[in-house]
Each structure stands twice: as structure tokens, then as C-alpha cells.
């Protein structure tokens, strides 16, 4: 965020798998928070002007050569600092304490015993369950610190130096297994750091509109509109900020869900008044893909062709200086931190040409996915768009296994519509993270109307998840599955068998290819 007057707590990234959760929990309290590289200097932090700092956990040992370090001057800024797990060990080590390998590693839920009163733990019980995940531990604390909590394997499970506003905890308050972790983080943010706790989507909208207007001035902005949640929210937000200075290009490649293209035009172009150039490129894409079966080849062709179509349309416009994108905070974290690891490449349609000389506008690049949905709701967008299912850039083309044909594509489009309709009617659409159908490219024998059939087998994939990184198959009611199956085989041509995918992630991925 460019506004240095905004109350914010920064989280220095030391590689913990829970880093994003720390920022999310602080935001849930009503205080803006963002991840930063552990390489940030005290001078840079002073310029950012946060009200507090959190040092995250991480896999390193502070005494190992090459372990992630910290600018020691950060502890001299006078700002409240909370060290979590590795962050606590690093703070203790840098300030004169001792850290050693634990004789017995501590992983999982453990009881934390508070030994004296601490503002950090105000309103929490004397004994509480917390999540421990560490192989090292502090064996001697720095001068000026005192112990406020212990666990069976950590005599220094919680320490503090109230004169310098420095706090350390060996456990992870950001995860739900630490039952009172949110209260502890709230105490740190609101009481120790003095935050007002008034950060909200309404404030975010006002700030972004102000930022966009200052950056863009009277110039023009181009947006690649996919119809998904992120680009749709960007479009509505920018429309509110700069009106007719925004032009959106919507490429219909022919692999969208049933009725999706019409809904985009009616809702975003109609109700919200976006200036949308719709490009009907179904034939252009299909001609390139007919008969192809390799999923990576399909993705590459669709990505490249999208770029070419977008480039063709963009070149017809004059005086465009800015390109808007729906980049989320998770994308920034994955690509921009020193500790990030990419678990799986995303399905998003390929990047835009390098020679397109635009300045970027990414108004969502400090938001998580759930916050984008909240923003869309605050902007008055309908649930059908705000709560739209995650959808891969290549669309239904990668939900057709084997060679791509119009016939197989239509089986997926029609069956997907039935699945979405029945899930919605059952009231489960907010409980299931993602659900769709796949043409497996397998044919089997069936009997319909006393006639032998030899038609396609479709798979239903439905998962539950918190963040999409791991997932379980959704245990949908049998009567609902039966109803969906019956409707599909009766209403969708060339289909005579339905199977249900009961594989979790891992070992499977969400999409089939």
C-alpha cells in the first residue's frame, strides 16, 4: 500500500508455511498487515512507517551458517516486535541469548502454562493449548527479558521485555490449533501496537480510488476481463474510480461455462456500465485445438492464442498508458519473496507480450482471495460473480481428456451447468470449495430406452478446502449425487455413465489435467 499514514503491521518472512496466516489474522482484527522480506533494513522500515513488526517462524536454525538474519537496528526503532517460533529464537540470539537444538523436538499441540500476568495474554486462561513446531529452543534469554509462559519442552515458551516492547513466543498463534491465538494477536495489535482496528473494505475502496486517480490522471486504462472474480472486481473498482477512461477486452475463447459470456456482458457491461470490447474467438481457438490430446500442448496454444487476440485488439486502441490486472497478494508472495516455493504452476492464461509498453495497475495485489470476495460484495456485485467457482484460464478445454472435440466439450458444458444448479439448490455452494465435471474420454456400454448405447463416462469432482493448497473430496449426500447423475444421463447427449472422484489433494490435484 502506498499510503504511509495507514496503520499497518508488517510481517518479516522467514519461510514459515503459516506466513500468510499471520497477515490474515491481523487483518481479521481490523489492522492492515503485509509480508515483507527478512532482508528489509531498519531504514526501509522507518520509511514504511508501520506501528508494529512480527517476525515469522521458519525452517532454519539461527546458529547455522547462511540462516535467515535480521538487521539488528530493527530492534532499536522503538516499535513493538513480536517474534514467533524462529522469530523468537532469532530475536533472542541477536540480543545476547542462547539457542540450541532441543533434546526432544516439540511438534503438535502442547499446553502453555502462563507463569505471570502479561498484557500479551490478557483475557486468556492460565493454561491453554498452543501449536508447537520446532526442533530448536531458547536456552537462555537476553538481558532485560523475563519468562511469562512455559511448556513441557520449552522453559522459555513466552518471554518479553516490556521496557523495549519486545515479545517472543515459541508457538504459532496464527493457526486454529492455538485456541486463544487470535486473542493474543489482538492484544499485540490493538493494545501493544495501539492500532484502532478500523481497517475495512470500505476504507480500502476509498484508498484505492484515490490512489488510482492520482496515478492515472486523465490517461486511459486497459483491462483483460476474463469473467472470473478477480478481473471482474478490478473492473468494477476501476469503473468507480475512473469511469470511461477504462476499456475492458473480453475474449470468449469458446471454453467458458454455460451462459458465462452472456452474464459477463449483462452484469458488468449492463448494470455496472463497463466499456467492454467482446471478442468472439471461438472458431479461432477451436481450429488450433481440434484433435489435440496433450494437456500441456492445449494450455500452451490457448495461452499463446489469447495473447495474440488481446494484442490484436489492444493495438486498435489509441492513447492507452496503463494495463490493469487482477493480481492477488498470494501471487505477489509466491513470486516476490526469498523464501517462497511454488507448489504447482497455475492454469492462468499466459502472460501478455513483453513489448506492450504499459504501466501496471494492480489494485488487488494486497488482498487475499476471501478479501477480494468481500470487496466485490462491498462494491454491490451479485453473488453469482463474487462467489463464482475458481476456473482455469484454458477453461473447459482442460476438462476434456483426450482429443478435443465440440461434442465432448458440450458434454462438459451441459453437465457442469446441471451440477452447479443442483449444488446451489441444495444450499451447499458455500460449503464446497470447487466442483465441476470432466469428460474422461472413456466410453462404456449402457442401455437407454431398450437400446444399447456406447457413450462417454463423465466424472464429478467436488472438494472441500480452506486455501486450495490441500483438499479433501466433498462428501456430498448420496441422494444429491443420485439426482445429479440421473439428470446428466437423461439431459446430456452422448453420456451414459457418471463416476464420483473420491481422491484428496495430495496425492491428486484439483483439476484432472
Swiss-Prot record:
User: Which residues are involved in binding ATP?
Assistant: 226-232
Ranges for domain GMPS ATP-PPase:
199-388
> What are its GO cellular component terms?
cytosol
List, alphabetically, the InterPro entries matched: Class_I_gatase-like (IPR029062), GATASE (IPR017926), GMP_synth_C (IPR001674), GMP_synth_GATase (IPR004739), GMP_synthase (IPR022955), GMPS_ATP_PPase_dom (IPR025777), NAD/GMP_synthase (IPR022310), Rossmann-like_a/b/a_fold (IPR014729)
Return one GO MF term.
ATP binding
Name all Glutamine amidotransferase type-1 domain ranges.
Answer: 8-198
EC class, as a word, reads: ligase
The UniProt record lists the EC number as 6.3.5.2
Q: Which reaction does it catalyse?
A: XMP + L-glutamine + ATP + H2O = GMP + L-glutamate + AMP + diphosphate + 2 H(+)
Task: Name the keywords, alphabetized.
Answer: ATP-binding, Glutamine amidotransferase, GMP biosynthesis, Ligase, Nucleotide-binding, Purine biosynthesis
Give the matching Pfam families. Answer: GATase (PF00117), GMP_synt_C (PF00958), NAD_synthase (PF02540)
**Ranges that cross the membrane:** none
Question: Pathway, per Swiss-Prot/TrEMBL?
Answer: Purine metabolism; GMP biosynthesis; GMP from XMP (L-Gln route): step 1/1
Instruction: Name the active site residues.
Output: 85, 172, 174
Role noted for this protein: Catalyzes the synthesis of GMP from XMP.
Q: Which NCBIfam families match?
A: guaA_Cterm (TIGR00884), guaA_Nterm (TIGR00888), PRK00074.1 (NF000848)
Oligomer and partners: Homodimer.
Give the protein name, as stated in the record.
GMP synthase [glutamine-hydrolyzing]
Q: Which organism is it from?
A: Lactococcus lactis subsp. cremoris (strain SK11)
Amino acid at each position: 500500500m502506498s499510503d504511509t499514514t495507514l496503520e499497518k503491521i508488517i510481517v518479516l518472512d522467514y519461510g514459515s508455511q503459516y506466513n500468510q496466516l499471520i497477515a490474515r489474522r491481523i487483518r481479521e482484527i481490523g489492522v492492515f498487515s503485509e509480508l515483507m522480506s527478512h532482508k528489509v533494513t531498519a531504514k526501509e522500515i522507518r520509511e514504511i512507517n508501520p506501528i508494529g513488526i512480527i517476525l515469522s517462524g521458519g525452517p532454519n536454525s539461527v546458529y547455522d551458517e547462511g540462516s535467515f538474519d535480521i538487521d539488528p537496528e530493527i530492534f532499536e526503532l522503538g516499535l513493538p516486535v513480536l517474534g514467533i517460533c524462529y522469530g523468537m529464537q532469532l530475536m533472542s540470539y541477536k540480543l545476547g541469548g542462547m539457542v540450541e537444538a532441543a533434546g526432544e523436538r516439540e511438534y503438535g499441540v502442547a499446553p502453555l502454562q502462563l507463569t505471570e500476568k502479561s498484557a500479551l495474554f490478557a483475557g486468556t486462561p492460565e493454561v491453554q493449548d498452543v501449536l508447537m513446531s520446532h526442533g530448536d529452543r531458547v536456552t537462555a534469554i537476553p538481558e532485560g527479558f523475563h519468562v511469562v509462559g512455559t511448556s513441557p519442552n520449552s522453559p522459555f515458551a513466552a518471554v518479553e521485555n516490556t521496557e523495549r516492547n519486545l515479545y517472543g513466543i515459541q508457538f504459532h498463534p496464527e493457526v486454529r490449533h492455538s485456541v486463544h491465538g487470535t486473542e493474543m494477536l489482538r492484544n499485540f495489535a490493538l493494545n501493544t501496537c495501539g492500532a484502532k482496528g478500523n481497517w475495512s473494505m470500505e476504507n480500502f475502496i476509498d484508498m484505492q480510488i484515490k490512489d488510482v486517480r492520482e496515478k492515472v490522471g486523465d490517461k486511459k486504462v486497459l483491462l483483460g476481463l476474463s469473467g472470473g472474480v478477480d478481473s471482474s472486481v478490478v473492473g468494477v473498482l476501476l469503473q468507480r474510480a475512473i469511469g470511461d477512461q477504462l476499456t475492458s477486452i473480453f475474449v470468449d475463447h469458446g471454453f467458458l461455462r454455460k451462459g458465462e459470456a452472456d452474464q459477463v456482458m449483462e452484469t458488468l457491461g449492463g448494470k455496472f456500465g463497463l466499456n467492454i470490447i467482446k471478442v468472439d474467438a471461438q472458431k479461432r481457438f477451436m481450429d488450433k485445438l481440434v484433435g489435440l490430446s496433450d494437456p500441456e500442448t492445449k494450455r500452451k496454444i490457448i495461452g499463446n492464442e489469447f495473447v495474440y487476440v488481446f494484442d490484436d485488439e489492444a493495438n486498435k486502441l489509441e492513447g492507452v498508458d496503463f494495463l490493469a490486472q487482477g493480481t492477488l497478494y498470494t501471487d505477489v508472495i509466491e513470486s516476490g519473496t526469498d523464501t517462497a516455493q511454488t507448489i504447482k504452476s497455475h492454469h492462468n492464461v499466459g502472460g501478455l507480450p513483453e513489448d506492450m509498453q504499459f504501466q501496471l495497475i494492480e489494485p488487488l495485489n494486497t488482498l487475499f482471495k476471501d478479501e477480494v470476495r468481500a470487496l466485490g460484495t462491498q462494491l454491490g456485485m451479485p453473488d453469482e460473480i463474487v462467489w463464482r467457482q475458481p476456473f482455469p484460464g484454458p477453461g473447459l478445454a482442460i476438462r476434456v481428456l483426450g482429443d478435443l472435440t465440440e461434442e465432448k466439450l458440450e458434454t462438459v458444458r451441459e453437465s457442469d451447468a446441471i451440477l452447479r444448479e443442483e449444488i446451489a439448490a441444495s444450499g451447499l455452494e458455500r460449503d464446497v470449495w470447487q466442483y465441476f465435471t470432466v469428460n474422461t474420454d472413456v466410453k462404456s456400454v449402457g442401455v437407454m430406452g431398450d437400446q444399447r448405447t456406447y457413450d462417454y463416462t463423465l466424472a464429478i469432482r467436488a472438494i472441500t478446502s480452506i486455501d486450495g493448497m490441500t483438499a479433501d473430496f466433498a462428501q456430498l449426500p448420496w441422494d444429491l449425487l443420485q439426482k445429479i447423475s440421473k439428470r446428466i444421463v437423461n439431459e446430456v447427449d452422448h453420456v451414459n455413465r457418471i463416476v464420483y472422484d473420491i481422491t484428496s489433494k495430495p496425492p491428486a490435484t484439483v483439476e484432472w489435467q
